[in-house]
Amino acid sequence: MTVTVRVSAKVNLALGVGGLAPDGFHPLATVFEAICIYDEVAVTRRDDSRITLTVSGEDADQVPTDETNLAWRAVELVREEFASEWGKRGHGADIHIDKSIPVAGGMAGGSADAAGALMAAAALCRLPYSPEELQPLAAQLGSDVPFCLTGGVALGRGRGDRLAPVICRGRHRWVFATSNQGLSTPAVYRRFDELGGTPGGETVPNDLISALTRGDLDAVAASLSNDLQAAAIDLRPELEEVLTVGREVGALTALVSGSGPTCAFLVRDTAGAKKVSAAVSNLPQVHRTRTARGPAAGAQLLPGPVGSFA
């Protein structure tokens, strides 16, 4: 039996990063928005104990298909934590991911796939699988995984995994320009530290939250920020040109998405999206452009029969 879950990408509307803490992590204050770019994650029971993972879709060859993939780890986590529900015979699972979310692009593609695999595995063995009920397990997999379950718009604190919903009136139109080359999140944080960091920088972006609540698009655009942007551009200077071109042709604002290298452009309407997309598509450092709206829902179980590992 197979369970399939649809998961959405994210963009950080604001990302405030504090200095490196003794535990090796940076405290964060971030506002997430889920975006209508989706992966689908299918988990199928096996009669033996093996776990396999296959990938299709955009840039599938760049996605690991072993235990280093967060989706694989999500299924293993459910199997370890709920051995009796999973099945007395120690069943395995086949995981398949159909990719549309950019790979290594700062849009939480790997975390979204982990959220999808977590929900699918829980549903297969008849465990509670609502986003709220899966939060403790999600936090064990990665900082972005809890938000990828819930979607919408949320304020994240701590490592980004302590979430509070944010009221968002209105919809946002985005253009995303992906890069020809990925950018390692740990490398970006290391460069952030080398550039001096921002001790105490994990502040709540009150102006942005107020603008979202009012549905004031221009105020939202004026309030977007990313403390990792300077580090990402220092590692990949060509990103600055992408941001500049998007602004020059009418984007309300432009910023690096999360740790990059994807560049995000907030636009007013469909015409603006087309103009920005056409302009940045001509740059040699841009792999492809995508238009999308937000906010989007979180992880969603797609219709179909649900089996059991019993």
From Swiss-Prot:
Residues 289-310 are annotated as: Disordered. The active site is at K10, D144. ATP binds at P102, V103, A104, G105, G106, M107, A108, G109, G110, S111, A112. Its EC number is 2.7.1.148. Pathway: Isoprenoid biosynthesis; isopentenyl diphosphate biosynthesis via DXP pathway; isopentenyl diphosphate from 1-deoxy-D-xylulose 5-phosphate: step 3/6. Signal peptide: none annotated. It catalyses: 4-CDP-2-C-methyl-D-erythritol + ATP = 4-CDP-2-C-methyl-D-erythritol 2-phosphate + ADP + H(+). Keywords: ATP-binding, Isoprene biosynthesis, Kinase, Nucleotide-binding, Transferase. One of its GO terms (biological process) is isopentenyl diphosphate biosynthetic process, methylerythritol 4-phosphate pathway. GO terms for molecular function: 4-(cytidine 5'-diphospho)-2-C-methyl-D-erythritol kinase activity; ATP binding. InterPro entries: GHMP_kinase_C_dom (IPR013750), GHMP_kinase_C_sf (IPR036554), GHMP_kinase_N_dom (IPR006204), IspE (IPR004424), Ribosomal_Su5_D2-typ_SF (IPR020568), Ribsml_uS5_D2-typ_fold_subgr (IPR014721). It holds the Pfam family GHMP_kinases_N. Catalyzes the phosphorylation of the position 2 hydroxy group of 4-diphosphocytidyl-2C-methyl-D-erythritol. Belongs to the GHMP kinase family. IspE subfamily. HAMAP family: IspE. This is 4-diphosphocytidyl-2-C-methyl-D-erythritol kinase. It comes from Cutibacterium acnes (strain DSM 16379 / KPA171202).
